[in-house]
Amino acid sequence: MIESQRHSYHLVDPSPWPISGSLGALATTVGGVMYMHSFQGGATLLSLGLIFLLYTMFVWWRDVLRESTLEGHHTKAVQLGPRYGSILFIVSEVMFLFAFFWASSHSSLAPTVEIGGIWPPKGIGVLDPWEIPLLNTPILPSSGAAVTWAHHAILAGKEKRAVYALVATVSLALVSTGFQGMEYYQAPSTISDSIYGSTFFLATGFHGFHVIIGTLFLIVCGIRQYLGLMTKKHHVGFEAAAWYWHFVDVVRLFPFVSIYWWGGI
């Protein structure tokens, strides 16, 4: 028998996923340190920790979707929590990328004597910003327009149109990731080539990692939309994915200007 409640908040049931996620994160961290320092068993512990962590993420999000879609626990008051959490998460990611861009700008504006006082350091090859980087830059903002199209389609109750828009968004995202892979393959330097290589691959790679995560997020939203699991009133997961994607596509402009173009002159 289901007991009635006089409030609009969801009192969650006891869950094993917080502790399992913590153990997975611990194993991943310790295994990563052991692997980097060539300790025996480091690679095994790292692999097991990652698998355990990914499994926990999957089943935890599965439970959240069940609570919202099948059990109807996500009232308007409950939906505010994921919205605020998504916004704060994006703000924290902005701080991450800001730190990497700051490191690149600091190193290029005041090059040390160890690299000859010039930027880029002598002997370090740089990518031509007017080739693949320029071609890749407008793709993500275009995908941002497509995800906005999907949002408007969901609000209008046009399910098929929303699916088409999400397919277009994911397709553009995959093209962008492919271009970045080509760019890395053709790069004349590596991450170990002085501070230039370190900051270049760290900043652009971290952004590329965000693109991959956002693509997976949108693929899940596309599948749920295709199955009819999102409505005009209940699509918080899609809103979080759209906000995250707009963050990703806008940020793309900063590495092009500050790292590819200005930092590579």
UniProtKB/Swiss-Prot annotation:
Its EC number is 7.1.1.9. It catalyses: 4 Fe(II)-[cytochrome c] + O2 + 8 H(+)(in) = 4 Fe(III)-[cytochrome c] + 2 H2O + 4 H(+)(out). The keyword Transmembrane helix applies. GO terms for molecular function: cytochrome-c oxidase activity. The keyword Transmembrane applies. Component of the cytochrome c oxidase, the last enzyme in the mitochondrial electron transport chain which drives oxidative phosphorylation. The respiratory chain contains 3 multisubunit complexes succinate dehydrogenase (complex II, CII), ubiquinol-cytochrome c oxidoreductase (cytochrome b-c1 complex, complex III, CIII) and cytochrome c oxidase (complex IV, CIV), that cooperate to transfer electrons derived from NADH and succinate to molecular oxygen, creating an electrochemical gradient over the inner membrane that drives transmembrane transport and the ATP synthase. Component of the cytochrome c oxidase (complex IV, CIV), a multisubunit enzyme composed of a catalytic core of 3 subunits and several supernumerary subunits. The complex exists as a monomer or a dimer and forms supercomplexes (SCs) in the inner mitochondrial membrane with ubiquinol-cytochrome c oxidoreductase (cytochrome b-c1 complex, complex III, CIII). This is Cytochrome c oxidase subunit 3. The lineage of its organism: Eukaryota, Viridiplantae, Streptophyta, Embryophyta, Tracheophyta.
